[in-house]
Structures are given as C-alpha cells and as structure tokens.
UniProtKB/Swiss-Prot annotation:
Family membership noted in the UniProt record: Belongs to the conotoxin M superfamily.
Disulfide bond entries: C54-C67, C55-C72, C62-C73
Molecular function GO terms recorded: ion channel inhibitor activity; potassium channel regulator activity; toxin activity
GO CC list: extracellular region
4-hydroxyproline PTM positions: P52, P63, P65, P71
Propeptide residues according to the Swiss-Prot or TrEMBL record: 20-50
Domain writeup: The cysteine framework is III (CC-C-C-CC).
Protein's recorded name: Kappa-conotoxin RIIIK
Function: Kappa-conotoxins inhibits voltage-gated potassium channels (Kv). This synthetic toxin reversibly inhibits the insect potassium channel Shaker K+, the teleost homolog TSha1 and the mammalian Kv1.2/KCNA2 channel. Interacts with the pore region of the insect channel, in a state-dependent manner. Causes seizure when intracerebrovascularly injected into mice. Is also toxic when intrathecally injected into mice, but shows no visible effects by intraperitoneal injection. Shows protective effects on cardiac tissue when administered after an ischemic event.
Source organism per UniProt: Conus radiatus
Signal peptide: 1-19
Amino acid sequence: MSKLGVLLTICLLLFPLTALPMDGDQPVDRLAERMQDNISSEQHTFFEKRLPSCCSLNLRLCPVPACKRNPCCTG
C-alpha cells in the first residue's frame, strides 16, 4: 500500500491538479469578461476609428456625397 502512496505522490508532483483547465479559464468565459470590460475605441487609442460604410446605410440618410456615386450603393 505504501508503494501506491509513493506512486500517487510522485504523479501529483509531476502533474499537479492546477495544470488542468478550470471552468473559469475557458476562452468563452474570457470573451464574456472582455465584453463586460466595455473596451471601445473611445477609451483605447490604438483601435482605429472607421466611418460606417455607405453601402450599409440608407442612401437618403447618408451625409457623404461620394456615397451616392459609389457603384455598390446604386443597387
């Protein structure tokens, strides 16, 4: 029985239980935490700010005249 205890102790020292991924360490959970942090381009300057695409907007509401000449928006 002592040989089994020594073997178990050696195995736990070589491969501790903390090496196993826990539920809180899953990538999906990390994504939810990042979304709750409210990281946005207004707070972080290294995110580039882009204007919305004219093709995704209603042309009558688009303030940019170049959007009305854009071939992808004429459909």
